[in-house]
From Swiss-Prot:
Molecular function terms from GO: structural constituent of ribosome
Modified residues (N-acetylmethionine): 1
Source organism: Saccharomyces cerevisiae (strain ATCC 204508 / S288c) (Baker's yeast)
Post-translational modification as stated in the protein's UniProt record: N-terminally acetylated by acetyltransferase NatB.
Name of the protein described by the UniProt record: Small ribosomal subunit protein eS28A
Miscellaneous remark of the record: Present with 94500 molecules/cell in log phase SD medium. There are 2 genes for eS28 in yeast.
Function noted in UniProt: Component of the ribosome, a large ribonucleoprotein complex responsible for the synthesis of proteins in the cell. The small ribosomal subunit (SSU) binds messenger RNAs (mRNAs) and translates the encoded message by selecting cognate aminoacyl-transfer RNA (tRNA) molecules. The large subunit (LSU) contains the ribosomal catalytic site termed the peptidyl transferase center (PTC), which catalyzes the formation of peptide bonds, thereby polymerizing the amino acids delivered by tRNAs into a polypeptide chain.
GO cellular component term of the entry, any: cytosol
A biological process term (GO) from this entry: translation
Assembly: Component of the small ribosomal subunit (SSU). Mature yeast ribosomes consist of a small (40S) and a large (60S) subunit. The 40S small subunit contains 1 molecule of ribosomal RNA (18S rRNA) and 33 different proteins (encoded by 57 genes). The large 60S subunit contains 3 rRNA molecules (25S, 5.8S and 5S rRNA) and 46 different proteins (encoded by 81 genes).
Superkingdom of origin organism: Eukaryota
Gene3D superfamilies attached to this UniProt entry: Nucleic acid-binding proteins
PROSITE patterns: RIBOSOMAL_S28E (PS00961)
Localization per record: Cytoplasm
Amino acid sequence: MDNKTPVTLAKVIKVLGRTGSRGGVTQVRVEFLEDTSRTIVRNVKGPVRENDILVLMESEREARRLR
């Protein structure tokens, strides 16, 4: 991984549900470790559970909510 790429650490606070054509993506609500008052919804590929720490390469993008 390139040391010049800024990354943001975020903690999974709630698993919202599965999405994707085959359910291979999990929608989660994350809280930023640097700014705990800020939370966003992201899509995560692979296994994930509450209290996991995610490394976000891009922290401004928010996922659309499940219907």
